[in-house]
Structures are given as C-alpha cells and as structure tokens.
C-alpha cells in the first residue's frame, strides 16, 4: 500500500483585527455597550418575557429537571434588579437650584424673590414661553449635567434605574417647580415630553415640617405640577427629615412635627386624588429617627403607610441588621409584618386620640422651648459643646458622605446632624435624645394630670414608642463619665453641667413615674443586660478619650500619634454604645 500523504500545512493566521471603535467616554478598544448591539433587549421587560416563555415551555414539556429551577431563579433576579442592579436616588439642596437658575436667567436676585414670583417664572420656563438669556452659563453646568446624565441613563438601563429626585431644604412650591424647569433645560424628557422623575421635596426642620401641608397644597393646585403628577401616575413622594428636625427642636418636637405632617399630608393627598408615598430619612441613632423599624411603622398615623414603606438605613447599621442572612430575613420579616398591620388597621380614629393630641402638642411645645433655650439661645453653649465633646476629632474623620458643616459658620445651626449627635453619644451624655423631654413631661403631668399622661404613654403607640426610645437612651447614658468630659470645658462646666444633669434626672424621674417602675428598662431584660455587659468595656475607652483629648488639645491638635489614638477610642466607643450616628 502507498504511504499516507504528508499533512497539509496549517493555514496562515488571520490578519490582526482592527481595534473596535470606542463608545463615547469609554477607553480605546472597549466593546460597545450591550444595549447598542444588534438584537439587544431594549429593556428588562423584554428579557422577562423571553424567560417566562422558556419557563412555560419547560413546564409544558416536563422539563422541570432540565433547568426549571434555574430559570425561575433568574426570573426573580431580573424582577428585582432589572438591568441596573440598584436604583440611584438624586439629591440636591434647593439653594443650588436657585443659584443655577439665577445664572441661567442672568438674574442674581432670583433666589431672594418671593416664591410666588419665582414660581411664575419657572412655569414659563417649563412651558417654553420664556427664553433663557444664558443657556450656557458655567455656574449652572454642574446642576444641568445631572439631568443630562439621567437623560442618557434611562434609555440604557431602564426607568427603574433612577429613583426620586430629592430636594433638600424644601420650603415652597417653587423648589419643586425648579426641578421641572432645570430638567427641561437639561434635556431630561421622555418620549411624551414629560420629565421622567419623581420630584420629592424633603422637609427637614420643624418649621418646614409645619409648613409642608401648605407647600403641597400649592403644588397640587399648580396646573404645571399637576400635569407632571398625572404623567407619574398621580403619586407624590415626600421625604421626611428626622435628623435636622431633631437638631432644630429636640426629639419630642421633631417626632410630633413628623406625626402631624404625615396626618396633614395624608388627608391632603386623599382630597386631591393623589397617592402619597412617605420616604423616611432615618439615621442610626434615636435623635436621627433610629430605633425599631417595626414599632415606628405601627406608631405611624392611620392611613399614612398604605402598603408602602421606604426609609434610609445608615452605613453603620447595615451590617448589624443585614450582614447575616438570618438577621436580614428577620428584619425584613418584621418590617413587612409591621407594614401589613399598619395598612390593615381601621382608618377610624381612636376616640381618645383627640385628647392625646392636645396633650402631645403641649408636651412638645414645652420640650422644644427648653431645648432651644439651652442649645440656641444661651450664650457660650457652643463653646461648651466644642470643649465637652470630641467634636474637633469627629470633624477630622473622613467617615461621612458630606462635610460636617454647611458653609463656614461655627454655630450649631451650621453643623450637620450626624456629627452633632455623634459627639453627644461619644461623651456618654446622649443629650440630643432627652434634652427637654423631662421638662415637657413634667409640665404635661401638671397640666393634664398624671393618670391622663400615663394612659397616653401606655395606650397610644406613637407616644409609647417615644417614651420607650428615650428610656433606652437614658439607660445607655452615664452622667458620671460625662462629668469628666464636662470638666474639659473649664469654667463652662460649672455653668452648664448642673442644668444638664438636672434635666437628665427630671426626664428619668418622669419616665419611671409614667411607667410605674423603679429602674430603667425594667420591662426589657435583654437590652438592660446587654448594656450592663458592654459598659465595662466601653468605660475605660471613655476615660482614655478624656485624657487623650486634654493632651491633644494642649499640644495644639496635631495630626500625630495622639490623634490616631483618639480615632481608635472614637471607633471603640461607637461600637460599644451603638445607635451613635
């Protein structure tokens, strides 16, 4: 037989392909976005439709074990995450919008004009009847770029990729109209020419919460904004600020203002045919709205939950509540159960609630007067605060998403709520959660009688939750250790410490009297025992921090080994005390 022929030589390698064109803003040679590829899904709903087709086909042809479970799992993931993974909320302070509009309109006095005048100008901008004198104003570029980015992102990642547009420090209807005007100027419009964003005013201070109903009434009556709401399904998102309202008026005044605002806005929305969705801007500490989510939901006004709950979870509590699968499921289960109970609760008010509201209003007013009298109206208190707390250390820590202060002012008003609360928890005083509470309760008992206030604290979920929260902070506070911090203030110690200590004891005595107990947390053995076990480890850190603060300040506050040791004590105390920021 003839030998086999020799093997054919290998084919020459193909020529090196030319580099792929880069997408706008992408690195050289990067692949084009999948959304731009031929045959790509336009949005997640198309992908879901195909997955459901596969699922039904497997079910019809006995293919359960040929991938049915995997398909259902992928279906759930697409339903939860779409093509975007997580929705991104947008947030900007109203003053930034006003500054941008002043530049675009070439009107430096625009922010100072009455809100009614600003609102009319903004309506004209939304309608396109008012030309913009300086559409390329550089001072407005940063604000407009946000809307341009949204306009580019929505077609690519889907409508669920962008959440609410939150306007912090909202004070009038003009603040919401400003978002619509800027969105149009930035080209952020859908196929119907509407702004594809939920505009969410954020009411933060006690005064702004009190005025929230008037603001929304003006918005619901505004034809331009009402048309926007119709495009958004007649659903209005409102964010409620727990942090700044408590810093502004104390815990009782803040909680009462939030309660009243929800009652008023729920009724107003029902009257206007709008479904209202409250977004609770809660923090990790009691002074910033923290606490047990389930109890807070059940204590919400009747009709305000309506099957919906949205709230912020702070970074320092996410791991504690959701870091372990079993804990995450338990927390979500408790929140879901609370929403169901609150939603199914009869809308008919409790017969005693009118009297309770009168008492709560009086207690809140007295508590706020005492709180503001010390914090905002007493000369020298800011200096005492800066000496008796480690605020000068906290201001240097790079742990927040925003600067510790608004602007360059040095008073309490300019300080953000997070460092304000954090500083008072570090020195073991917890003042932000109970200052004024004792005065308010004592005056309420004197005016309405002990039995009436005790009944309210027992039977009204709103007030019972408030009293329990304050009791927990009192149990975590240690006036003996706080006194050592207070002495760092020199002459300020003799001036301020006695009054603070007296209010602490007044609050403690009033709560024990209302509950008919001898000791704090008598009804919560697990929490009381947890505090007793943690404190022996936290106390040495607190004493060490006092010593380090004195030495570091005497040395001129350098960023040296003393400072780094102070940072370590801050972290340790925060971990031990919990509910700190």
Task: Label the model's feature ranges.
Residues 1-7, 18-91, 98, 103-112:
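Extended, highly charged clamp/arch subdomains and adjacent linkers
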Residues 47, 51, 67-71, 94, ...:
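Active-site-proximal structural scaffolding
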Residues 82, 201, 284:
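Conserved, mostly hydrophobic/aromatic
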Residues 84, 89-91, 96-98, 110-135, ...:
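Acidic, glycine-enriched catalytic cores built around paired aspartates
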Residues 86-88, 93-177, 181, 185-190, ...:
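Active-site cores of enzymes that catalyze phosphoryl transfer or operate on phosphate-rich substrates
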Residues 155-160, 183-195, 219-234, 263-277, ...:
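Secondary-structure transition/capping motifs at alpha-helix termini
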Residues 211-215, 288-296:
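Catalytic cores of alpha/beta
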Residues 222-230, 234-247, 290-293, 302-330:
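Metal-dependent DNA phosphodiester-chemistry modules and their immediately adjacent helices/loops
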């Amino acid at each position: 037989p003839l030998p086999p022929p020799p093997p054919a030589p290998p084919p020459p390698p193909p020529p090196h392909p030319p580099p792929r064109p880069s997408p706008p803003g992408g690195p050289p040679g990067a692949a084009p976005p999948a959304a731009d590829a031929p045959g790509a899904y336009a949005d997640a709903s198309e992908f879901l439709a195909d997955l459901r087709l596969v699922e039904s086909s497997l079910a019809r042809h006995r293919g359960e074990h040929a991938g049915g479970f995997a398909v259902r799992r992928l279906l759930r993931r697409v339903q939860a995450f779409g093509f975007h993974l997580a929705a991104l909320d947008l947030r900007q302070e109203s003053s930034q919008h006003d500054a941008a509009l002043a530049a675009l309109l070439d009107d430096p006095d625009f922010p100072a004009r009455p809100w009614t005048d600003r609102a009319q100008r903004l309506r004209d901008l939304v309608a396109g009847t008012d030309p913009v004198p300086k559409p390329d104003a550089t001072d407005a570029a940063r604000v407009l770029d946000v809307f341009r980015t949204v306009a580019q992102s929505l077609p690519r990642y889907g409508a669920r990729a962008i959440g609410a547009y939150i306007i912090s420090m909202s004070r009038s209807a003009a603040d919401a109209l400003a978002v619509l005007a800027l969105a149009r100027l930035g080209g952020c419009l859908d196929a119907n020419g509407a702004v594809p964003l939920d505009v969410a005013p954020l009411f933060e201070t006690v005064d702004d919460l009190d005025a929230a109903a008037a603001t929304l009434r003006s918005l619901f009556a505004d034809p331009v904004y009402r048309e926007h709401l119709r495009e958004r399904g007649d659903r209005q998102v409102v964010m409620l600020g727990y942090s700044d309202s408590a810093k502004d008026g104390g815990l009782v005044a803040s909680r009462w203002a939030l309660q009243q605002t929800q009652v008023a806005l729920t009724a107003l929305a029902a009257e206007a045919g709008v479904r209202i969705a409250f977004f609770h801007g809660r923090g990790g500490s009691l002074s910033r709205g923290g606490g047990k989510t389930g109890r807070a939901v059940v204590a919400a006004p009747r009709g305000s939950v309506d099957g919906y709950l949205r709230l912020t979870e702070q970074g320092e509590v996410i791991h504690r509540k959701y870091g372990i699968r079993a804990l995450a499921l338990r927390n979500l289960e408790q929140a879901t159960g609370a929403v169901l109970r609150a939603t199914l609760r009869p809308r008919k008010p409790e017969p005693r609630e009118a009297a309770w509201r009168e008492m709560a209003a009086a207690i809140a007013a007295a508590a706020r007067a005492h709180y503001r009298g010390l914090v905002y109206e007493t000369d020298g208190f800011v200096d005492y605060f800066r000496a008796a707390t480690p605020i000068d250390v906290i201001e240097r820590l790079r742990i927040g998403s925003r600067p510790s202060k608004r602007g360059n002012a040095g008073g309490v008003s300019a300080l953000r709520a997070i460092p304000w609360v954090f500083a008072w928890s570090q020195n073991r005083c917890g003042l932000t959660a109970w200052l004024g509470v004792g005065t308010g309760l004592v005056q309420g008992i004197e005016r309405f009688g002990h039995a009436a206030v005790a009944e309210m604290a027992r039977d009204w979920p709103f007030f019972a939750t408030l009293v329990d929260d304050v009791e927990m902070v009192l149990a975590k506070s240690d006036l003996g250790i706080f006194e050592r911090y207070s002495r760092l203030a020199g002459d300020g110690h003799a001036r301020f410490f006695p009054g603070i200590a007296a209010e602490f004891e007044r609050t403690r005595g009033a709560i024990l009297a209302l509950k008919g107990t001898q000791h704090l947390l008598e009804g919560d053995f697990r929490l009381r025992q947890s505090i007793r076990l943690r404190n022996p480890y936290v106390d040495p850190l607190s004493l060490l921090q006092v010593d380090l603060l004195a030495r570091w300040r005497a040395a001129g506050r350098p960023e040296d080994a003393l400072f780094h040791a102070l940072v370590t004590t801050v972290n340790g105390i925060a971990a031990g005390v919990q509910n700190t920021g």
